[in-house]
Amino acid sequence: MEVKKDNLSSQAKLWNFIYGFAESLVLKCAVQLDLANIIHNSGTSMTLSELSSRLPSQPVNEDALYRVMRYLVHMKLFTKASIDGELRYGLAPPAKYLVKGWDKCMVGSILAITDKDFMAPWHYLKDGLSGESGTAFEKALGTNIWGYMAEHPEKNQLFNEAMANDSRLIMSALVKECGNIFNGITTLVDVGGGTGTAVRNIANAFPHIKCTVYDLPHVIADSPGYSEVHCVAGDMFKFIPKADAIMMKCILHDWDDKECIEILKRCKEAVPVKGGKVIIVDIVLNVQSEHPYTKMRLTLDLDMMLNTGGKERTEEEWKKLIHDAGYKGHKITQITAVQSVIEAYPY
């Protein structure tokens, strides 16, 4: 009997792996239908017919909607309850991150990560193990990720929205939990800072700091032009503007060790000998950890391998990388986010 139970459990686990993509794409469907916002804005739970009548595309196949909602309830994203003989749907706690208009909304990340083109490199995972040059992204889409973004403005916008989404999540935790890292800083450059969302959080929390976002021209072109943030276009491999501190959020994981050392050396040149530092916001892997984010961090490591040729790093790998770039020391602080904060001291 135990053997049968083990077989059933193992087969069920494998089937769930096989159809693992379904949860991502049903989640995408929920976002596209705006289900969380419709229920949130109603102020109460809703029947299927009420929900159906408010969907953006009409007419609606209510049987199909019922089946999608049944799956979303099973995912524990939505709730269902019988009230006065009617089945009504509400929001489970994770669904609040699908509600637009607050700083922790994750819709931008969902739409980018589940985009057909951005998922394509995963189909080339095996090819990435061949030892041949080129990333899975290049094999799937014919160019590297940076060239692709420059050539496809609509995808670049999707990507930038996801990065801005991620920045709001991370920076909220960073400012609240280790704002002291900005003590004594009057100027800061966010290298690879996208459209400026991350550094804007710093500018608002610490108005005395003059903040600059530094990124590639096609990225800066999409910046909304925040009054608190100065925008500069350029190439971090060639030059980094001078400041008391350099910040890089989710940048070094895009690159291999050799390129990271080059970037870190450019950062070292940009900060003053006295009090200068580099603030790295990136994942610190601990594969033995039972932390809820461990699987996510390992997934992102594969994602970097596929898309950029980069990697997520363990604490020991960060220590070696920073040392090899000629820095004198570093400090790692965990925050309530997927990433940690690494302060690197060049002098």
From Swiss-Prot:
One Gene Ontology term from the biological process aspect of the record: methylation
Enzyme class: transferase
Active site: 253
UniProt catalytic activity: norcoclaurine + S-adenosyl-L-methionine = coclaurine + S-adenosyl-L-homocysteine + H(+)
Binding site for S-adenosyl-L-methionine: 192, 215, 235-236, 249
InterPro entries to which the protein is assigned, alphabetical: COMT-like, O_MeTrfase_dom, Plant_O-MeTrfase_dimerisation, SAM-dependent_MTases_sf, WH-like_DNA-bd_sf, WH_DNA-bd_sf
Any matching Pfam family: Dimerisation
UniProt keyword annotation of Transferase present: yes
EC number in record: 2.1.1.128
Keyword Methyltransferase: yes
Molecular function per GO: (RS)-norcoclaurine 6-O-methyltransferase activity; O-methyltransferase activity; protein dimerization activity
Pathway of action: Alkaloid biosynthesis; (S)-reticuline biosynthesis; (S)-reticuline from (S)-norcoclaurine: step 1/4
Function: Catalyzes the transfer of the S-methyl group of S-adenosyl-L-methionine (AdoMet) to the 6-hydroxyl group of norcoclaurine to form coclaurine.
Assembly, per entry: Homodimer.
Protein name: (RS)-norcoclaurine 6-O-methyltransferase
Organism whose genome encodes this protein: Coptis japonica
